[in-house]
């Protein structure tokens, strides 16, 4: 059970919400603020004075006054008309994050929503009744309207859900959770729809996956150093302290620890090779830069996870209703775009190491890591697959945040595209996962070929894990299943756990 304290969510809590079957409860300390916000809205609605989102239309129709007897219909119509998403359903882990983030935002008491509505969301979450939310349809301002409308429609008994993973109607989902359809009151539909929770949830969910891939890449890169008989001197702490970037310093320390005590490395200490190619030698510099970007993105996304991104905002102490632009997800878009750059570079560097290993001139290993080259092609086309995926990532890493299209008759004339920026991270991460799987296989093959010498004590379990699933590549065979099984292990964090490093979300 995780207690949600609005405005005080942590990255470890968010990772658990995405990855573990935890349940939620709202911190009772938030109840007074929530109730005060709801009362403030009720008082404004009763007076009948125009206030955006409470008794007016929306977007370009903000100047249209809505009579008191139509306020409930206004909120219902808002939810139903905005539920226009398309595409595949959002991943379960992202939906769980989305719901938790929405609860945190509402729970700060500046949205004017009743606790009854929040309790219904928590009940659905804890019953494992998750809204079916199409993943496409948001431009990231005014908030993530379409995705959040699909979440909200379920509270009205409209739309679809997943009941413990099985697709069903919203009414069936409410029944399983022991709920009845709600009637939303003034401002509540808008409070549910307005916000950056979809883009932030997608960005966080994919960030956690990319963090795991980063740690796996440290392990794969270190194993490739041994496979290529590379030097550990470029990882000397003194080099990296002189430059000063913390990510680089931390990455170099990881490589030193992973490769410490390697018999392969000790076997060629006195060789006449002066410098390794950049894909081996400059790993701390490249991976360190990725790490710095990822840490910054995590900081931004944590702030956004705890933010109130509704509009308008209710200030119960003064009774004011202030319209602003906290729904604009530009910070999320930038963070997601930076994560895309980092994830693509992790894959690009791994692809270069694969290319090095299969090149006999550079690695000193048999061509394409197989005996009887010619009749056997070995890792030749596995590298082509890695190259294809790395190239695809370069296109996917193009920043989404530089694009904008005006909407709502030019009332909403600049948007963030944060949801697309966050959503495409999943494709980049999947490509990088498979590149790393190919590198792990190639590096393990190279280490085998260095016999009788072995890799380091830290990397020995990695070899055991790989060889426990995939045998040494003796002769050409149907290769795709080998890649698939190692990619599955990468996704399960089997190799990430070996890295002597952890992110803030894992602590």
Curated annotation (Swiss-Prot):
Matching NCBIfam families? hutH, PRK09367.1
At the top of the EC hierarchy, this enzyme's class is lyase
Localization terms from the record = Cytoplasm
One Pfam family recorded for the sequence: Lyase_aromatic
Q: Name one GO biological process term.
A: L-histidine catabolic process to glutamate and formamide
Might you report a single GO cellular component term?
cytoplasm
Leader sequence segment: none
Instruction: Kindly list the positions at which 2,3-didehydroalanine (Ser) occurs in this protein.
Output: 142
Its domain of life reads Bacteria
- Keyword Cytoplasm tagged: yes
The major lineage groups are: Bacteria, Pseudomonadati, Pseudomonadota, Betaproteobacteria, Burkholderiales
What is the name of the gene encoding this protein?
A: hutH
Q: What Enzyme Commission number does this protein have?
A: 4.3.1.3
Q: In which pathway does it act?
A: Amino-acid degradation; L-histidine degradation into L-glutamate; N-formimidoyl-L-glutamate from L-histidine: step 1/3
Q: Where is this cross-link: 5-imidazolinone (Ala-Gly)?
A: 141-143
Could you tell me one molecular function GO term of this UniProt entry?
histidine ammonia-lyase activity
Catalyzes what?
Answer: L-histidine = trans-urocanate + NH4(+)
Q: What is its main location?
A: cytoplasm
Q: What is this protein called?
A: Histidine ammonia-lyase
Q: Which UniProt keywords apply?
A: Cytoplasm, Histidine metabolism, Lyase
Q: Which family does it belong to?
A: Belongs to the PAL/histidase family.
